[in-house]
Regions:
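Core catalytic alpha/beta fold that binds nucleotide/phospho-ligands
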Residues: 1-195
Length: 195
C-alpha cells in the first residue's frame, strides 16, 4: 500500500451540529421557558443583540384574526430559526475546540460587520454569563443597560463558523485551531486575516 500524505494543516479541528427548529419554536412559544433558554445559551452581549433585533416582534399583542395569527406564527418561526442556528453554531464550536472543555457561555457567535456572515469567539476568561430570568428585560430601560455592555473588551480566540438553514433544521460548522497559538488572543488572528 502506498504511503499517505498527512493532512496539510494538522492544527485545525472541525465541529458540526444540527438543531431541529420546531423544538426551539416550542421554547419561543413558552413564556416561562423562553427567558431561561435565552439566558442559558447567550452571553450578556448576545442577549443584548438579540433583544435589540427581536424585541418589537416578540412584544406584539396576540392577534385576534386568522391572518394576524399566521403572521405572528411566521415571525416566531423566524426567531426560532435564528436561535436554532446560534445553538448549532455554539455546539459546533464546542465540538471543534477539543483542547478545552467549553460550555455555551464560553462561546460567542457574532455577526460580521459589513456582511451577513457570522464568526465565533472562544472566550479566554469567562465572567458569569448566566443571570436570572429577570435579567432578560423587554423594556426600553433594560435594553439601554444591557447595550452598554456590548462594547466590554473580552479576549478570546476567533474561530470560523458557518450557519445554514433548510426546512425544519439549522446546521452549523466550525473550523478552529486545535490549540490557540501564542499571540492569537485579543484580535491578532483577525489582524493577520485568519477570519
Amino acid at each position: 500500500m502506498p504511503p499517505f500524505r498527512p493532512f496539510p494543516s494538522p492544527s485545525l479541528s472541525i465541529g458540526t451540529d444540527i438543531c431541529h427548529i420546531p423544538r426551539v419554536l416550542r421554547l419561543v412559544n413558552n413564556q416561562k421557558l423562553f427567558p431561561r433558554f435565552l439566558n442559558r445559551i447567550f452571553t450578556q452581549p448576545e442577549r443584548a443583540a438579540f433583544q435589540t433585533r427581536f424585541r418589537n416582534l416578540l412584544k406584539q399583542e396576540t392577534a385576534s384574526d386568522d391572518a394576524g395569527r399566521k403572521e405572528q406564527a411566521f415571525v416566531r418561526r423566524g426567531i426560532a430559526a435564528h436561535l436554532a442556528g446560534r445553538w448549532a453554531a455554539k455546539e459546533a464550536v464546542i465540538k471543534a475546540c477539543t483542547w478545552r472543555r467549553l460550555v455555551l457561555s464560553d462561546v460567542r457567535i457574532l455577526k460580521r460587520e459589513q456582511s451577513s456572515g457570522v464568526y465565533g469567539v472562544v472566550l479566554d476568561q469567562v465572567k458569569a454569563a448566566r443571570q436570572t430570568e429577570d435579567a432578560f428585560d423587554w423594556t426600553e430601560e433594560g435594553t439601554d443597560a444591557v447595550e452598554q455592555d456590548i462594547g466590554v473588551d473580552r479576549s478570546g480566540q476567533i474561530v470560523k463558523v458557518s450557519i445554514s438553514h433548510d426546512g425544519d433544521y439549522a446546521t452549523a460548522v466550525c473550523l478552529a485551531a486545535e490549540e490557540p497559538a501564542e499571540g492569537d488572543v485579543g484580535g491578532e488572528a483577525a489582524a493577520r486575516g485568519m477570519f
